[in-house]
Amino acid sequence: MPFRLLARVAAPISLALLAACASPSDRNITLAGPDASARASGSSAASVDESGVAVRPIKYARQKPGCSGTCPRIEVDSIAIESAPKLTQLIDNALAYMTGVDPDRSGNYRSLQEYEQHFWATAQARDVTQLRARVRDAYKGLITVELTTGQYLTGAAHGIPATQFLNWERDRNRVLALNEALVPGRQDQFNAALQRAHGRWKTQLEDYQRDPGAFDRMWPFQPTDNFALTRTGVVMKYDAYAIAPYASGQPEVVIPYSELTGVLDPKWLPG
C-alpha cells in the first residue's frame, strides 16, 4: 500500500467526541470490569505508579486468529484506573477512535474489542497496530493520561503515530478542555506564550540550526490544543509532520508556569 501523508494524521479528540466515546454502555468497556482480566491475559493486580495513581496494567499481544506465517498483529500496553472507571472506559474508547487515520479502512467501532474484530477483517499481512496508555502525571486534582497509537501498514514508508492527552478532573469526573483551563479571554496570550516556547524549542533542532529561514518556511509555528498539565509546566503535543520533519517524532513544547500568570486559571498554577 503506498504511503499517503494525511493532512492531520490523527487530529486531537474534541470534547464532543470524548463525550460520545464515554458511552455508559458496559458492552464497550474492554479495559474495565470484572471480566477484563480474562480478555487481557497480560493484566495484573493494581499498583500505585510514580504519579501516585492506582493503575492496573493491561498488556498483551495477539496475531490474527487462524493465521500462520506473517500475520497482522495488535499490541496493547494500557491501564485501568481503579478509582476512575469512567476514565478507564474513555481510555478504551479513545484509543479505538485514534486508529481511524485512513478513511478507506476506518470502521464503525467504539472500543478496543470492537476495533480488534475490524482489524482482523481488514488488515494486510504485515499490518501492526500498537495501542498504549499511561498516566503522565497527577497534578492539582487532575489525572493526566497520555494515549499513544502507532499504525504500521503494509507497504508504507514508515509508521503513523498519534498521541492524545486527557486531563481528567477527579472531582467532576470529566475531561478538562484547554479553554476551560485558561482565564476567560486569554487564549491569544496563551498562544503567544506557546509561540515563545516553540521558538526556544526549535533552536535545539539540527534542521533549524542548519538553515533557520528554510525551516521556518517549511515548518511554521501553529497552535495546538493537545495539552497536559504537569508539575513541571504545560506540555503541548504536536503530531508528526505538524511543526517539524518526521524524524523529529511527535514534538513536545513545554510552557513554564512562570509565563502563564494571569493567563492560566490560578487553580492550575503551582503553589
Report residues per predicted region.
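Bacterial N-terminal signal peptides that target proteins for export
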Residues: 1-11
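Compositionally biased intrinsically disordered regions enriched in Thr/Gly
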Residues: 22-271
